[in-house]
């Protein structure tokens, strides 16, 4: 008989397998069952019903990369701050100091990026 510890891992393993298997099966069945009728109209770029007048493949400037990277960093910060805020009363002063250090480190990085004029658009 499996212990509670092993049973917990079994449940996680089942969810992991289902999470991988169900999308793969659904996509495979969709690919096998759909009609395959390629045409030039289906291959064109969709522009709200208007006939496309140039190629849709454009190059983005490298500045977009920096903004995307900063967004991801502060988005991950939110992911770390939310559980801390929910359990704040149970964590105590040490967790508050740890979170303040974490936020200050991110703010120092933001100030550095601002000082280096990384955030200026033009």
From Swiss-Prot:
What keywords does the record list, in alphabetical order? Cell membrane, Membrane, NAD, Quinone, Translocase, Transmembrane, Transmembrane helix, Transport
Q: Where in the cell is it found?
A: Cell membrane
- Catalytic activities: a quinone + NADH + 5 H(+)(in) = a quinol + NAD(+) + 4 H(+)(out)
Query: Entry's Pfam families?
Result: Oxidored_q4
Q: What is its EC number?
A: 7.1.1.-
Membrane-topology annotation of the record: Multi-pass membrane protein
Please list every transmembrane segment annotated in the UniProt record, as residue ranges. 10-30, 66-86, 91-111
Known InterPro entries for this protein? Answer: NAD(P)H_OxRDtase_bac/plastid (IPR023043), NADH_UbQ/plastoQ_OxRdtase_su3 (IPR000440), NDAH_ubi_oxred_su3_sf (IPR038430)
| Positions in coiled-coil regions | none
- Give a GO cellular-component term: NADH dehydrogenase complex
Gene Ontology MF terms:
NADH dehydrogenase (ubiquinone) activity; NADH:ubiquinone reductase (non-electrogenic) activity; quinone binding
Q: Its domain of life?
A: Bacteria
Q: Does the keyword Cytoplasm apply?
A: no
Q: Which family does it belong to?
A: Belongs to the complex I subunit 3 family.
Sorted alphabetically, which PANTHER family does this protein's record hold? Answer: NADH-UBIQUINONE OXIDOREDUCTASE CHAIN 3
Task: Describe its partners and assembly state.
Answer: NDH-1 is composed of 14 different subunits. Subunits NuoA, H, J, K, L, M, N constitute the membrane sector of the complex.
Q: What does this protein do?
A: NDH-1 shuttles electrons from NADH, via FMN and iron-sulfur (Fe-S) centers, to quinones in the respiratory chain. The immediate electron acceptor for the enzyme in this species is believed to be a menaquinone. Couples the redox reaction to proton translocation (for every two electrons transferred, four hydrogen ions are translocated across the cytoplasmic membrane), and thus conserves the redox energy in a proton gradient.
Query: What protein does this entry describe?
Result: NADH-quinone oxidoreductase subunit A
The encoding gene is: nuoA
């Amino acid at each position: 008989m499996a212990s509670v510890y092993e049973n917990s891992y079994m449940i996680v393993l089942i969810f992991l397998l289902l999470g991988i298997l169900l999308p793969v099966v659904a996509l495979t069945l969709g690919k096998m069952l759909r009609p395959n009728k390629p045409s030039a109209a289906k291959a064109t770029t969709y522009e709200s019903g208007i006939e496309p007048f140039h190629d849709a493949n454009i190059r983005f400037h490298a500045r977009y990369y920096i903004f995307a990277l900063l967004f991801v960093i502060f988005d991950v910060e939110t992911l770390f701050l939310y559980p801390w805020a929910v359990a704040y009363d149970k964590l105590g002063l040490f967790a508050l100091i740890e979170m303040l250090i974490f936020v200050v480190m991110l703010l120092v990085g933001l100030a550095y990026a601002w000082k280096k004029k990384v955030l200026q658009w033009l």
